[in-house]
From Swiss-Prot:
InterPro entries: UPF0181. This is UPF0181 protein PC1_1931. Signal peptide: none annotated. It comes from the Bacteria. Pfam families: UPF0181. It comes from Pectobacterium carotovorum subsp. carotovorum (strain PC1). Residues 54-79 are annotated as: Disordered. Belongs to the UPF0181 family.
């Protein structure tokens, strides 16, 4: 789920796509159409409770002592 957006049923998603396509056929840019439909959806669902689930790895909850490194595959330059 995108922050601030309610979870939508498949039918609601399909309706949103059709609304975006309708706005675009009237000459609106895709970005503007998406933003407008998102605002309409937020307005319709204002005050609704949205269930949020966070997926956390149990083994990394208290790993603040561990160091993490990123290997980009590049050789490091020696100075």
């Amino acid at each position: 789920m995108i922050a601030g957006m309610p979870a939508l049923t498949h039918k609601q998603q399909q309706d949103a796509v059709e609304r975006i396509q309708e706005l675009m056929s009237e000459g609106m840019s895709s970005g503007q159409a998406i933003a407008q439909v998102a605002a309409e959806i937020r307005q319709e669902h204002q005050g609704d409770n949205v269930a949020v689930m966070f997926d956390e790895d149990d083994d990394t909850v208290n790993d603040s002592d561990e160091e993490h490194y990123f290997d980009d595959g590049e050789e490091e330059d020696e100075q």
